[in-house]
């Protein structure tokens, strides 16, 4: 299972669609990974959404990741958890999760990527790769140069997140990313399934060109 197209749900830009709706539509468009992310929802409601998305991703053959909430991820039977810089440290999470449980880590530098790899991360995500409006606290983009540096420093799967669009996805793949994580480029679109499918096709074309 790869990380080519990694879709993060966000009800605030989902045009009235729920996390479950967005996950179903993105999975239909070929998303390889669905991440449930919502910093506002109470744990009980987040778990309810996670259980529903677990069923959707299982049927679609996609990975299911929960952002930040390790407890919800484990309770829902998710494939893994994604941890940001201010979340539980990767090493502590690795110590308590079941075997085979995936841990992803947001990183903003080579040093952070190397540290995450050493602590047991299964993949790292350069965040933000470009400036983005999807996360208020994302900060300025790290750029393609940082992506290339991290690619040279770690052998883990590398995902680019932040400001990824159809216009720049080929450059991101050429810089060494194994996949891209997107929010607005898919879940903010009117036709989520078509947006996911189009982006996935662009990723596949970029990878084929780089071979």
UniProtKB/Swiss-Prot annotation:
Pathway(s) = Cofactor biosynthesis; thiamine diphosphate biosynthesis; thiamine phosphate from 4-amino-2-methyl-5-diphosphomethylpyrimidine and 4-methyl-5-(2-phosphoethyl)-thiazole: step 1/1
Q: Which UniProt keywords apply?
A: Magnesium, Metal-binding, Thiamine biosynthesis, Transferase
| Record note on cofactor | Binds 1 Mg(2+) ion per subunit.
Specify which residues bind Mg(2+) according to the UniProt entry for this protein. 68, 87
- Gene Ontology biological-process annotations: thiamine biosynthetic process; thiamine diphosphate biosynthetic process
> So which cofactors does this thing need?
Mg(2+)
Reactions catalysed, semicolon-separated, are: 2-[(2R,5Z)-2-carboxy-4-methylthiazol-5(2H)-ylidene]ethyl phosphate + 4-amino-2-methyl-5-(diphosphooxymethyl)pyrimidine + 2 H(+) = thiamine phosphate + CO2 + diphosphate; 2-(2-carboxy-4-methylthiazol-5-yl)ethyl phosphate + 4-amino-2-methyl-5-(diphosphooxymethyl)pyrimidine + 2 H(+) = thiamine phosphate + CO2 + diphosphate; 4-methyl-5-(2-phosphooxyethyl)-thiazole + 4-amino-2-methyl-5-(diphosphooxymethyl)pyrimidine + H(+) = thiamine phosphate + diphosphate
Which CDD domains does this chain map to? Answer: TMP_TenI (cd00564)
GO (cellular component) term, any one: cytoplasm
The residues listed in the UniProt record as binding 4-amino-2-methyl-5-(diphosphooxymethyl)pyrimidine, with positions renumbered to this chain, are 35-39, 67, 106, 135
Which molecular function GO terms apply here? magnesium ion binding; thiamine-phosphate diphosphorylase activity
Transmembrane stretches in the record are none
In terms of InterPro entries, this protein maps to: Aldolase_TIM, ThiamineP_synth_sf, ThiamineP_synth_TenI, TMP_synthase
Q: Which domain of life is it from?
A: Archaea
Q: What is its EC number?
A: 2.5.1.3
Q: What does this protein do?
A: Condenses 4-methyl-5-(beta-hydroxyethyl)thiazole monophosphate (THZ-P) and 2-methyl-4-amino-5-hydroxymethyl pyrimidine pyrophosphate (HMP-PP) to form thiamine monophosphate (TMP).
Name the NCBIfam families for this protein: thiE
Instruction: Name the protein family.
Output: Belongs to the thiamine-phosphate synthase family.
Protein name per its UniProtKB record? Thiamine-phosphate synthase
């Amino acid at each position: 299972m790869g990380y080519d197209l990694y879709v993060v749900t966000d009800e605030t830009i989902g045009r009235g669609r729920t996390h479950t709706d967005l996950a179903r539509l993105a999975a239909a468009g070929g998303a390889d990974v669905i991440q449930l992310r919502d910093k506002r929802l109470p744990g009980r409601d987040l778990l309810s959404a996670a259980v529903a998305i677990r069923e959707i991703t299982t049927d679609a053959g996609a990975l299911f990741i929960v952002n930040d909430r390790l407890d919800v991820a484990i309770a829902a039977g998710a494939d893994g958890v994604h941890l940001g810089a201010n979340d539980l440290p990767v090493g502590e999470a690795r110590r308590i999760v079941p075997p085979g449980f995936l841990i992803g880590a947001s990183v903003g530098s080579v040093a952070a990527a190397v540290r995450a790899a050493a602590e047991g991360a299964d993949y790292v995500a350069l965040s933000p790769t470009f400036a983005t409006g999807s996360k208020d606290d994302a900060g300025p983009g790290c750029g393609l140069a940082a992506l290339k540096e991290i690619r040279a420093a770690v052998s883990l799967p590398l995902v680019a997140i932040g400001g990824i669009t159809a216009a720049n996805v080929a450059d991101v793949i050429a810089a060494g990313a194994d996949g891209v994580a997107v929010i607005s480029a898919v879940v903010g679109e009117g036709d989520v399934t078509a947006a996911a499918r189009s982006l996935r096709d662009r990723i596949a074309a970029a990878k084929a060109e780089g071979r």
